[in-house]
Swiss-Prot record:
Keywords: Ribonucleoprotein, Ribosomal protein, RNA-binding, rRNA-binding. NCBIfam families: L18_bact. Belongs to the universal ribosomal protein uL18 family. It comes from the Bacteria. One of its GO terms (cellular component) is cytosolic large ribosomal subunit. This is Large ribosomal subunit protein uL18. One of its GO terms (biological process) is translation. CDD domains: Ribosomal_L18_L5e. Part of the 50S ribosomal subunit; part of the 5S rRNA/L5/L18/L25 subcomplex. Contacts the 5S and 23S rRNAs. It comes from Albidiferax ferrireducens (strain ATCC BAA-621 / DSM 15236 / T118) (Rhodoferax ferrireducens). GO terms for molecular function: 5S rRNA binding; structural constituent of ribosome. The gene is rplR.
Length: 121
């Protein structure tokens, strides 16, 4: 039997394969207990077009500097910031790659904030 982490990584790999056949940029999310990271990667999977995370100094300052990057409010801020950066480089449409994480909580908050800020997926 696969462990919980191995199952998540297998789901993530299968999702990346499906997204690669579409040829659109993908918004990928990684979360840890302390931080959340998001990137927009080109359709061919070679180049990172935009990225944002709660580990960035100016994001931490905007969140109050308390190091609370592992909550829903922080995820919403990252989603909005990432959408703005992606639109600045000309990316409007992406495929959402949640990397095997459940679409719930911080992952959902990030996705909803990115949609509200103008990304389509």
């Amino acid at each position: 039997m696969l462990t919980k982490k191995e199952q998540r990584l297998r789901r993530a790999r299968q999702t990346r394969i499906r997204i690669a056949t579409q040829g659109v940029a993908r918004l990928t999310v990684n979360r840890t207990n302390l931080h959340i990271y998001a990137s927009v990667i080109s359709g061919d999977g070679v180049k990172v077009l935009a990225s944002a995370s709660t580990a960035e100094a100016e994001v931490r300052k905007a969140l109050g500097g308390s190091g609370k990057g592992g909550n829903v409010a922080a995820a919403q801020a990252i989603g909005k910031r990432l959408a703005e950066k992606a639109k600045a480089v000309g990316v409007e449409k992406v495929a959402f790659d949640r990397a095997g994480f459940a679409y719930h909580g911080r992952v959902k908050a990030l996705a909803d904030a990115a949609r509200e800020a103008g990304l389509q997926f």
